[in-house]
Amino acid sequence: MATYIVGDLHGCFDEFQLLLEQANFDPQYDELWLTGDLVARGENSLACLRYVKALGERATVVLGNHDVHLLSTLQGIKAVKPKDKVDAIFEAEDRLELQNWLRSRPLVAQHPVHQFLLVHAGVSPEWDLATTLACAREVEAVLQGEQFADFLAQMYGNSPDQWRADLQGIERWRYALNVFTRMRFCYADKRLDFDCKLPVEEAPEGLKPWFELDNPFYRQQPIIFGHWASLIGYQTPDTIYALDTGCVWGNHLTMLRWEDKHIFTQKRLNLD
């Protein structure tokens, strides 16, 4: 049995299938972990959702910002952006089933054997493992509860941008969701920045990647994430694995086989 971890799909279903073929992925024996953002911008978000859902317990996927935004559009909270190319999901007979499946996905997942932590964007520089998992479970409970639409309507925004243990309600949940699905850079005082999406080398002075801030937890166990395609070629610390390599933007899709750390890649097909 092998454990495969795939970066952001963004609707790139054909590339996803070719990547699995390279590794001879067999869902009967192997397990698949995905960094989220299954949907948006690529040509076949619907197929990505259906395929991963059909794998059942053989697949573990964490929610990304585009996945959460899709939930908002399905609820009529936000308008659909044509560039997201998700119309087929709205027209699908199983859209409600897909929505309910998607909102029941975790924000953070820890492998029971290998102990790596999977998250879409990152882990707060102010959290340890216990706080990370506790905050994830809190927000997951809201997303999976009866008031999830109310939460989706209030989740947008950049405040608060710094953790406090006494945060409560929507402020606590928004901070946690932003960390798990949107974070890239932080300031030295560990405040989150949501404006800069540049490669690290081009970032304004005073900003650092979240994983380069001083947090002993980052060195205690592996953390695998996606979300940040402009990290391609950047040397992360040994315990940090960045797997979003911008397939939807014309680069390639990346998959890591955990047991031997072998990397599989698949170039983007047929760009518009």
Swiss-Prot record:
E.C. no: 3.6.1.41
Top EC class of this enzyme: hydrolase
Catalytic activity: P(1),P(4)-bis(5'-adenosyl) tetraphosphate + H2O = 2 ADP + 2 H(+)
Entries under SUPFAM superfamilies matching the protein: Metallo-dependent phosphatases
GO molecular function: bis(5'-nucleosyl)-tetraphosphatase (symmetrical) activity
Annotated InterPro entries: ApaH (IPR004617), Calcineurin-like_PHP_ApaH (IPR004843), Metallo-depent_PP-like (IPR029052)
Keywords, alphabetical: Hydrolase
Family annotation (Pfam families): Metallophos
Highest taxon listed in the record's lineage: Bacteria
PANTHER family xrefs: CYTOCHROME C5, PTHR40942
Family, as annotated: Belongs to the Ap4A hydrolase family.
Annotated function: Hydrolyzes diadenosine 5',5'''-P1,P4-tetraphosphate to yield ADP.
Protein name: Bis(5'-nucleosyl)-tetraphosphatase, symmetrical
Source species: Glaesserella parasuis serovar 5 (strain SH0165) (Haemophilus parasuis)
Lineage: Bacteria, Pseudomonadati, Pseudomonadota, Gammaproteobacteria, Pasteurellales
